[in-house]
């Protein structure tokens, strides 16, 4: 079964109410449906998932290719890693990936989305998804001398995405051999075309030209210096990707909340930005944060990578302890608390 079929199932389920989702996920699904209806027109020159040919003459479909790669990569922690199992994408992840990577310009074939803003609660496979995207941009995007950075303000955070990406490669010798990937202590490289994938603390140097910048837990950033430097450095790339992925936070005057506010305006149609992909999981304003429904709505991997027992017990603790409430709301329900 194709990954696009899984994505379509998810869109259908969200829009007909069978899948619990907040208004922003409904808006993202509706946006995809609207775009599919108007694709390839003068006002909207993008087409979804056409057959393409890479530099090596191989035919591929962009929406499937990203998912196929990630499905070949192994889990890096928990029960699935212990069983040496590969990643199995859920339909919400298929929607996320196929939409982000499947749209291309009808004339140039270049990717439509240059930026993604995603808010996903903790333990929903956020870093794993980011690591998989990093691998694709590093080894399969056809970018000569690709520069992929897992960027953060602290070393610990920069490694949150790079560590699983490095482990995936270490445990996939056939993949590394076929792509010529060298796995070093603190970076990965493809010698043949000069591509590299590495963690980055603070801003890249002046000579950096990122083809992909992954910014994990953006809510922790006090300023926009890192992201702005990344964006400036991307100017020389044909189809760069700035991938921002975060839980909610408490700094409502910081750059992440401003980006969120802008992304919501794109989802509601107040602003038009055809190159920004936004996916904001969470609960709606009138939802009861102490309900199981709230947990199911905010956590797309509820019962999969994030156990229902775990979430219900965290919720119970937060309900009984006022000083634990904010952490629970931001990390597990994506509620911003100022």
Question: Model regions: which residues?
Answer:
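Phosphate/NTP-binding elements of NTP-utilizing enzymes
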Residues: 2-338
């Amino acid at each position: 079964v194709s990954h696009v079929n899984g994505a379509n199932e998810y869109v259908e389920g969200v829009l007909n109410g069978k899948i619990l989702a907040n208004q922003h996920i409904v808006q993202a699904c509706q946006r995809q449906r609207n775009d599919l209806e108007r694709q390839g027109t003068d006002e909207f020159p993008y087409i979804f998932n056409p057959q393409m040919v890479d530099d090596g003459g191989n035919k591929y479909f962009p929406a499937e290719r990203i998912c196929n790669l990630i499905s070949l990569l192994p889990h890096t922690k928990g029960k699935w890693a212990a069983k040496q199992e590969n990643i199995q994408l859920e339909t919400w992840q298929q929607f996320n990936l196929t939409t982000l990577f499947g749209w291309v310009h009808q004339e140039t074939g270049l990717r439509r989305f240059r930026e993604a803003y995603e808010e996903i609660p903790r333990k929903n496979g956020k870093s794993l998804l980011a690591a998989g995207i990093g691998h694709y941009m590093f080894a399969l995007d056809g970018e000569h001398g690709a520069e992929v950075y897992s960027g953060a303000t602290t070393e610990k955070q920069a490694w949150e995405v790079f560590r699983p990406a490095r482990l995936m490669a270490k445990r996939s010798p056939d993949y590394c051999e076929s792509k010529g990937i060298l796995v070093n202590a603190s970076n990965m490289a493809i010698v043949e075309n000069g591509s590299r994938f590495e963690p980055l603390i603070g801003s890249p140097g002046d000579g950096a030209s990122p083809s992909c910048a992954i910014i994990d837990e953006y809510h922790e950033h006090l300023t926009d210096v890192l992201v702005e430097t990344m964006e400036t450095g991307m100017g020389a790339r044909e189809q760069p990707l700035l991938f921002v992925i975060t839980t909610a936070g408490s700094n409502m005057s910081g750059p992440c909340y401003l980006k969120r506010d802008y992304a919501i305006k794109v989802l509601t149609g107040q602003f038009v930005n055809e190159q920004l992909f936004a996916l904001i999981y969470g609960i709606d304003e009138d939802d009861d944060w102490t309900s199981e429904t709230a947990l199911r709505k905010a956590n797309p991997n509820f019962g999969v990578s994030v156990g229902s027992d775990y979430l219900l017990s965290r919720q119970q603790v937060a309900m009984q302890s006022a000083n634990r409430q904010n952490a629970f709301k931001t990390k597990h329900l994506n509620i911003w608390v100022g």
